[in-house]
């Protein structure tokens, strides 16, 4: 939902987009499925932000914080090995992505990567021209937007072996619920690892 929508030719942060449409509405076009037959759209959102390529990235981290998150999440290009740009989850951009994708459900991935943090930062709002906003601005304004960061208590334990919602630490569940409420879409799936069975269904 987040990175895919922002790289879409029509809905993304042009000119830092792909040459095609990356939103869910165009999936039937390439697969031969009638659009009206889509009953559910599952948006995939990382528990933090990552970015490939140039362009505005409001909540981007630099230095040691960025490197720690990059190392924890193995955030480097599959072919080039180039380090990806990373930062806390951007709820403003994610909410926009959910809206333009028409998502009816969300799969929140890589929750386990945040397990090393005492306090987990989230970009809850933007500040633009001295005003706080929850609306995703026009691309030309993004360079001037500043992140408004809030913090959620971390859980500080390995959750990669957890296989049910109730087994997750309370603070991990609270983080998921916080994101869910902020983006206005149910999070039905939570990924806690790279294994096939590391997907928790709520």
What are these regions (language model features)?
Residues 2-202:
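Non-transmembrane, aqueous-exposed alpha-helical and coiled segments at domain scale
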């Amino acid at each position: 939902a987040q990175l895919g929508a922002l790289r879409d030719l029509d809905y993304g942060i042009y000119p830092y987009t792909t040459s095609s449409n990356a939103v869910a509405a165009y999936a039937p076009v390439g697969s031969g499925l009638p659009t009206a037959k889509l009953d559910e759209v599952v948006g995939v959102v990382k528990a933090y932000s990552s970015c490939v390529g140039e362009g505005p990235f409001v909540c981007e981290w630099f230095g040691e914080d960025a490197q720690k998150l990059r190392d924890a999440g193995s955030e480097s290009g599959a072919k080039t090995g180039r380090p990806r740009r990373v930062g806390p989850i951007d709820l403003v951009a994610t909410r926009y992505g959910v809206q333009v994708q028409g998502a009816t459900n969300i799969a929140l991935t890589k929750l386990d990567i945040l397990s090393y943090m005492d306090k987990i930062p989230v970009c809850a709002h933007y500040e633009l021209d001295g005003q706080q906003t929850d609306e995703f601005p026009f691309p030309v304004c993004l360079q001037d937007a500043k992140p408004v960061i809030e913090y959620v208590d971390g859980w500080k334990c390995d959750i990669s072996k957890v296989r049910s919602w109730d087994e997750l630490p309370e603070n991990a569940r609270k983080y998921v619920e916080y994101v869910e409420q902020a983006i206005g879409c149910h999070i039905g799936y939570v990924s806690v690892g790279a294994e096939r069975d590391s997907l928790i269904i709520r």
